[in-house]
Amino acid sequence: MSIHVVSQGETIADIAAEYGVSPNRLSFDNQLSEQDHLVAGQALLVLQPDVIHETARGETIPSIAARYGVHPLQIVRNNPFLTSQPFLRQGQYLVILYRGQSDRPLTADGYAYPFINKRLLGETLPYLGYLSIFSYGFTESGELIPIDDEPLLEAARVYGTKSVFVLTPFSEAGTFNSNLVTVAAQNMEVQENLIDNIQRTVQSKGYSEVDVDFEYIRAEDRLAHVEFVRRLTQRMNAIGITVSVALAPKVSADQPGLLYEGVDYRLLGEAANSVLLMTYEWGYTYNHSGCR
């Protein structure tokens, strides 16, 4: 992998020729079109092939992967145009290995709304171990608010990506609601109904994990919320489903504020199978469009 800093007057074709790569791939890796004008000082990622395979008639991605002793997904990751191409073409050149490419294992998780751009989803899934589908809300009686998750679940299955059922205290208006947290934590009848509904849904749809993303937990619900997570984890583990908890980024146990006072790192870590430490330096639907 190289980083090329653009000089005045350089084009994508010039840079591609310098490194011996295709202009199409250089453009794809940097999310550019070949017609884009480069700016002096702009940094471009350049991936240089080390092992290249020319496809023959009748070959498939699995057969080529077996020949080189690599996973089929490595072929797809190294040639991302394959996500939108159903069949290999005779005479195509595929990158099997890039120069300096690491084989160190890495597990990545990505959140996605049901309305995600399908091309973007297809380009991203080969790199993900988990796809967190955002999100299922619920009512004050413990009924789930359904989402159109089937297209994402099917796409995840194609790439062997595990799907994560994200549970949020979202009202039908689509916003976080502290009252829903209280009801789920304190009302045992509602809690039991909610857990039953989660179990039915994850089993019928083929989810691998449940992620509890509860925000704005009141201080008085702190321990009851932990017990809810503990009960949910016990039920899910019994059917082979793991449970994770998304945690707000606290810097001290007594940090004031509605985002933090109801979150007990130690107890929630003990109650769930894993935790996800969130950051708020991102763009999202109701905030700025990027990091700030």
What are these model-derived regions, one by one?
Residues M1-Y19, Q42-G69:
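Primarily a LysM-type cell-wall glycan-binding module
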Residues T11, T60, H71-Y130, D196, ...:
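Non-catalytic accessory regions flanking glycosidase/transglycosidase catalytic cores in CAZymes
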Residues N30-Q48, P86-R99:
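Short, structured interface segments
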Residues R99-E192:
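Glycan-recognition patch characteristic of GH18 chitinases/ENGases
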Residues T107-D109, Y130-S132, K162-V166, E209-D211, ...:
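Structural preference for beta-strand elements that scaffold enzyme active sites
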Residues Y111-F115, Y136, T168-F170, E215-I217, ...:
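Active-site beta-loop-alpha junctions enriched in small/polar residues
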Residues S132, N193-A224, N273-H288:
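Active-site groove signature of glycoside hydrolases
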Residues E140-I147, L223, R231-R292:
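Substrate-binding surface in catalytic domains of secreted glycosidases
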